[in-house]
């Protein structure tokens, strides 16, 4: 406790001279080992090809365009590419992963599988999907999308049962009913294999409700069976509703292996694409920037729901998205958030990114990295810092040595001057 006055004095000095080192609302990185996944707001190729030299289209500083650390596609998102025919192969690797995408699948698109479907279910799917992606990218370096080969021994082909507007679901694939089967009360199987990745994120989906076809109602039932380990993953329809339901998806994390997709009723589904996860790393939280439209369009908060501590830091602007290129591209607030990618930062926390790792007037919550040491401000003008006293002790020693040197020099010159006057 005898050191507390010194701590108070040092903190008071820091505050007096204006060194606050507050957390800043940006995404950043510790070093050069980072990667960003995005959409048109970070798609340098889109700007070059479609809007030459007009970089106001983006929220990303153009200086980062040649970094080789960005995988972005205008009009797309990882979720959209994962499930639908509108595909872009998002691929990237880094110790520190940043996501700024998701806006290209929102309530504004109003997607639902059938005319009596429910877009709310798809927003739920989006949240569950990104939860798995964020959790896994906190412990994996590499993400890419891969095709999943499957073998179905019947003659029926995949059907575009689930579509809305320009979006057509192709993952999982729906295998149509065989021509010689009279109704949907039948068992169907297909083999699929996962190889080449450490782990995979694959969809397992069902219609959770009573599906009507030719005056009959059916309950969906889907399973994946790992033929190597004997583990089975399954979903059965549990709802009795006949309208307002849609395609409920769970996102399984599976190892490499040989699998059997099984349907006991309705149509067989089999995964055709997977998130490929490779190269395990030391746990490093991902950073997610809110991806939303201008208020004139309806957005959702599913990336925020998916981004939870301790595996994810969420960054957002406090104001409406208002772009300078158009209302949905080039917002100053989000450009400011992405500006942190221009420099290294030592510490990440719930409140934001700290630029320096020495001291701060704000105590970092859920800190990660080399973070400043500080405590809560208990009065309006006196932050009480609690940290290792060694730097202060060393500073005191240096100041003491400096004072001694100055005194010695003063005495030397005073004596020397006195001698000169004596001889003069």
Curated annotation (Swiss-Prot):
Residues in the Virion surface compartment per record: 17-392
The organism of origin for this protein: Porcine hemagglutinating encephalomyelitis virus (strain IAF-404)
Record localization: Virion membrane; Host cell membrane
Bilayer-spanning residue ranges: 393-413
Position of the signal peptide: 1-16
Modifications made to the protein after synthesis: N-glycosylated in the host RER.
Protein name, per record: Hemagglutinin-esterase
Keywords: Disulfide bond, Glycoprotein, Hemagglutinin, Host cell membrane, Host membrane, Hydrolase, Membrane, Signal, Transmembrane, Transmembrane helix, Viral envelope protein, Virion
Lineage: Viruses, Riboviria, Orthornavirae, Pisuviricota, Pisoniviricetes
UniProt-listed SUPFAM superfamilies: SGNH hydrolase (SSF52266), Viral protein domain (SSF49818)
Main location as per UniProt: virion
Enzyme kind, highest EC tier: hydrolase
């Amino acid at each position: 406790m005898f050191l507390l006055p010194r701590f108070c004095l040092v903190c008071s000095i820091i505050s007096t001279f204006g060194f606050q080192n507050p957390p800043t609302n940006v995404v950043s990185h510790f070093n050069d080992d980072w990667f960003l996944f995005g959409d048109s707001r970070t798609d340098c190729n889109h700007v070059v090809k479609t809007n030459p030299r007009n970089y106001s289209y983006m929220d990303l500083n153009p200086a980062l365009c040649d970094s080789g650390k960005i995988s972005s596609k205008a009009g797309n998102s990882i979720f959209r590419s994962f499930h639908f025919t509108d595909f872009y192969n998002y691929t990237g690797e880094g110790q520190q992963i940043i996501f700024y995408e998701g806006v290209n699948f929102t309530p504004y698109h109003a997607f639902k599988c059938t005319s009596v479907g429910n877009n709310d279910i798809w927003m739920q799917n989006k949240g569950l999907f990104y939860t798995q992606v964020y959790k896994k990218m906190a412990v994996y370096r590499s993400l890419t999308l891969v095709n999943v080969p499957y073998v179905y021994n019947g003659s029926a082909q995949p059907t575009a049962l689930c579509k809305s507007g320009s979006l057509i679901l192709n993952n999982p694939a729906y295998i149509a009913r065989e021509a010689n089967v009279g109704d949907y009360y039948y068992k169907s199987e297909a083999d699929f294999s996962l190889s080449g990745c450490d782990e995979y994120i694959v969809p397992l989906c069902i219609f959770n409700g009573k599906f009507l076809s030719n005056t009959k109602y059916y309950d969906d039932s889907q399973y994946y069976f790992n033929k190597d380990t004997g583990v089975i993953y399954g979903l059965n329809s549990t709802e009795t509703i006949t309208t307002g339901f849609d395609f409920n998806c769970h996102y399984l994390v599976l190892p490499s292996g040989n699998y059997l997709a099984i349907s006991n009723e309705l149509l067989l589904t089999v995964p055709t694409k997977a998130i490929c996860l490779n190269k395990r790393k030391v746990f490093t939280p991902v950073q997610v920037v809110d991806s939303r439209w201008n208020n004139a369009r309806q957005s959702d908060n599913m990336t925020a729901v998916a981004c939870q501590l301790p595996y994810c830091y969420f960054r957002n602007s406090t104001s409406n998205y208002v772009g300078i290129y158009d209302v949905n591209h080039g917002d100053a607030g989000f450009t400011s958030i992405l500006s942190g990618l221009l420099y290294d930062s030592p510490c990440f926390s719930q409140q934001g990114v700290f630029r320096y790792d020495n001291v701060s007037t704000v105590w970092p919550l859920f800190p990660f990295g080399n973070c400043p040491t500080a405590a809560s401000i208990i009065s309006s003008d006196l932050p009480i810092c609690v940290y290792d006293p060694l730097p202060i002790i060393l500073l005191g020693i240096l100041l003491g040595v400096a004072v001694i040197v100055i005194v010695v020099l003063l005495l030397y010159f005073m004596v020397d001057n006195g001698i000169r006057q004596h001889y003069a």
